[in-house]
Amino acid sequence: MLNIHDILGNDDENLLSYQCKHITKDKLTLPSHDFVDKVFGLSDRNNRVLRSLQTMFSHGRLANSGYLSILPVDQGIEHSAGASFAINPIYFDPENIVKLAIESGCSAVASTYGTLSLLSRKYAHKIPFMLKLNHNELLSYPTKYHQIFFTQVEAAYSMGAVAVGATVYFGSETSNEEIVAVSNAFAKARSLGLATVLWCYLRNPAFVANGVDYHTAADLTGQADHLGATLGADIVKQKLPTCQGGFKAINFGKTDERVYSELSSNHPIDLCRYQVLNSYCGKVGLINSGGPSGKNDFTEAARTAVINKRAGGMGLILGRKAFQRPLSEGIQLLNLVQDIYLDPNITIA
């Protein structure tokens, strides 16, 4: 078993001992073994949605912990198949995607219609399926950013999936139509008993100002999470925040100085906690993404997991860091992340 203290290195004390003083943990609904009963059992979700949610929370190495570890592989569309899989060509074969999720003990596997439909009869009863409904295909020229539907909610129901996922590019020129399309799709999904997960991403060239990329600012991503929760998502997926003050730097929208002085700080756990706060104080689970693969994947994945867990988040949805390496290493990396959520010594800040 890898040692978390060695992996975090110089960040060890800063991340593992920090205590949030702005938004304290008692103000949040935190992940727990009875989260579905405690939160969604009081909602308008029908019994089949509750069963679908509980199926994910009861599967894999994190079963009955209240946390989720999801393997997402839609990068063949979002980043092109060559760019995603050339480093590890076995994943051009979609069966290896599902095998990685199963062998690493993930809570669910999220992928495209082509991948999951091809394998559903063999695997839908062995690991929870999450069908990603829309994508930004990368073959248009010039490159544009517009989430379009590749399949329908009914396909998820037919293949035995327990959840659907979708993306909205909040802040983009097409965000309004994406919001309407996703709202309609999620309503249909709920009627069929499927859980809903929203990738709440920001996309606008104006969000890069004075050399700073505010696509990952806590105030902007927090508002995106809040919009996702408002759309009725059961879980929101968001990038880990890296900065603060997007509204002020870009000089748009509305904010309040207390967001920066009383509700957050520059500490990474406080920045992530502001995302949790916007996710209905944790009642809509926040899962953070793992980001691209690089030289320090184990350290970065561990760091993201510690920040998410200690902030009050619900888990990680980590793809490229896992599948852009040999299968055994991908399993080891995913298990490292899962071990952090299972470790009772890594507590809520």
Curated annotation (Swiss-Prot):
GO terms for cellular component: cytoplasm. The keyword Ribonucleoprotein does not apply. It comes from the Bacteria. Disulfide bonds: none annotated. GO terms for biological process: glycolytic process. Its EC number is 4.1.2.13. Pfam families: DeoC (PF01791). Gene3D superfamilies: Aldolase class I. The keyword Repressor does not apply. NCBIfam families: PRK09250.1-2, PRK09250.1-4. PANTHER family: FRUCTOSE-BISPHOSPHATE ALDOLASE CLASS 1. Belongs to the DeoC/FbaB aldolase family. FbaB subfamily. This is Probable fructose-bisphosphate aldolase class 1. It comes from Chlamydia pneumoniae.
